[in-house]
Amino acid sequence: MSYQEHEKTIQEISNYIEQHLKDDLPLQTLAKHAGYSRFHFHRMFKKVIKKSVVDYIRERRMIQAAKDLIHTDQRAIDIALQYRFSS
């Protein structure tokens, strides 16, 4: 598979992550969606996105939670729990 094909696959997975930020996103599930082993998926994701999968998901959840804090009347604890941040 060429780098461009890997890049396209990882972009599709990052879109999937964006749509499911409030859901559990285990590495194994994401790798399966990409059609890669966990190891290969983790390696390719980091190569394309320049961050580990876990760091990327955490960052995207933080950004979305911050937007929700600004633009909604939801309590901070409710937003934190929606985006899977624990106390």
Walk through the language-model features, giving the residues of each.
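Short coil turns linking two alpha-helices in DNA-binding domains
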Residues: S37-R38, S86-S87
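Residues within the alpha-helical elements of helix-turn-helix
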Residues: H33, Q82-Y83
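Terminal helix-turn-helix DNA-binding modules in bacterial transcription factors
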Residues: E7, Q11-Q28, K47-Q82
